[in-house]
Amino acid sequence: MNKRNWLLALSLSLAFSPCYADWAKLKAAASDLGAAVSETSKEVWQDVSDFSKKSWASISAWGEEAFNTAGVWTDKSIATGKEWLKAADKELNEMLNPKTAKEARIAINTMADTALIRLFNEQPSAKLLFDKAYGYAVFDSRKFSLMLHTNQGAGVAVNRKTGKHTYMKMFGAGLAAGIGGKFYQQVILFEDKARFDAFVTQGWEATSEVGVVAGKESAELTAKYNGGMAIYQIGEKGLLLDANISGSKYWIDKDLTETSR
């Protein structure tokens, strides 16, 4: 059995295992898969729908199931999330600079999963807001979309009621330098349908009045929605306190969204 077929067999065996199966075994399998994917990254991208999507789906099952299950983000969730992120971030590094729309969508979806788990690990109270959210959007400063300019980021808005994904772009002054680090991620939670739909269909520009939930004061309290939105920014070293998103703009990525229908 060649390496490609072996990976596919492993992926499918993981995909049919319970989401909360023996984590040690899942972690070991994910580690092995990650190492093999690293060696065959070119082959991965040659057949995204047949290989990369299946291999990542098996690893990401825990993450998606975890953040879509209502309830408190516990110490156990944090510990498991940290281990999951090690495997997820390794896979995500292979997805930089996608060449096709399919590759870009898979990369952005994967990025969004990692951002949510990272956020809940940093601030568990955000999980309670997420449980109440009608929808959410996640953005990243790295190159996970096609033909992005220096100050642009890529992201996806997800309707939690229907599961529909709308791919989007973001412009912000802090994106070029990753706000002092290699990258940063932004998570926006929407309290209701009206606010979410307006963001997706009309785009949005952040004003100076818009605050980031994770400030010095609110980080110690139970987070609340502000004007129907809750906004968090996360860097490679954790939650960015008092981050200023004033002037940031968001709009639909028609190329990725329309070709996904």
UniProtKB/Swiss-Prot annotation:
Biotechnology: The antidiabetes effect of BefA was evaluated using type 1 diabetes mellitus (T1DM) and type 2 diabetes mellitus (T2DM) mice models. BefA protein significantly reduces blood glucose levels, maintains the body weight, improves the glucose tolerance and exerts a protective effect on islet beta cell morphology in a T1DM mice model. It also downregulates the expression of TLR-4, p-NFkappaB/NFkappaB and Bax/Bcl-2, and the secretion levels of the pro-inflammatory cytokines IL-1beta, IL-6 and TNF-alpha.
Subcellular localization(s) per the UniProt record: Secreted; Host
Signal peptide positions (record): 1-21
GO cellular component, one term: extracellular region
ATP-binding found in the keyword field: no
Superkingdom of source: Bacteria
Region (SYLF domain): 99-261
Keywords: Secreted, Signal
Record bears the keyword Secreted: yes
Note: Membrane permeabilization by microbiome-derived and host defense proteins is necessary and sufficient for beta cell expansion during pancreas development, potentially connecting microbiome composition with diabetes risk.
Domain notes: Contains a lipid-binding SYLF domain which is essential for activity.
Function: Stimulates the proliferation of insulin-producing beta cells during development in gnotobiotic zebrafish and mice. BefA is a microbiome-derived protein that traffics from the host intestinal lumen to the pancreas to act directly on pancreatic islets. In pancreas, interacts directly with host beta cells and elicits their proliferation via a mechanism of increasing membrane permeabilization. Can also permeabilize bacterial cell membranes, but does not show killing of target bacteria.
Record protein name field: Beta cell expansion factor A
Gene expressing this chain: befA
